[in-house]
């Protein structure tokens, strides 16, 4: 998934987006999708404890299956997992929730590499979340 796939989120009003991305992939923040303003906090994330402190103060984490998604779930924070079509066994097919993290909601691809419909569903859910 690339930052450009998140373009539908730009239409959701009342949200502030914070990037928890570090390393070379964070360079995508230099050219975000039109209208999507993302705060880059990588310079303040020295270690995973810093990431945990930030996650603990966010209203919602939207992430692919990474350590950040698991961290948010373990901290009991609401997390929306953008899950690939052939997801790992731990996400259990046919479920939108997770037995591992009560605050996790899954948005799964309908086909391999298909993020468009996922992000449309996420944008709709985010509209409801902020209202």
Give names to the regions the model predicted.
Residues 1-131:
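Catalytic machinery of carbohydrate-active enzymes
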């Amino acid at each position: 998934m690339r930052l450009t796939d998140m373009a539908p989120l730009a239409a959701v009003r009342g949200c502030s987006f914070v990037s928890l991305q570090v390393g070379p992939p964070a360079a995508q923040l230099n050219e975000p999708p039109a209208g999507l303003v993302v705060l880059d906090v990588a310079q303040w994330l020295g270690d995973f404890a810093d990431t945990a402190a930030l996650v603990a103060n966010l209203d919602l984490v939207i992430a692919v299956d990474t350590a950040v998604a698991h961290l948010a779930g373990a901290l009991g924070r609401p997390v929306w997992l953008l899950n690939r079509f052939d997801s790992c066994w731990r996400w259990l097919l046919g479920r939108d929730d997770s037995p591992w993290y009560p605050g996790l909601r899954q948005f799964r691809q309908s086909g391999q590499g298909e993020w468009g419909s996922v992000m449309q569903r996420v944008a709709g859910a985010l509209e409801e979340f902020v209202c």
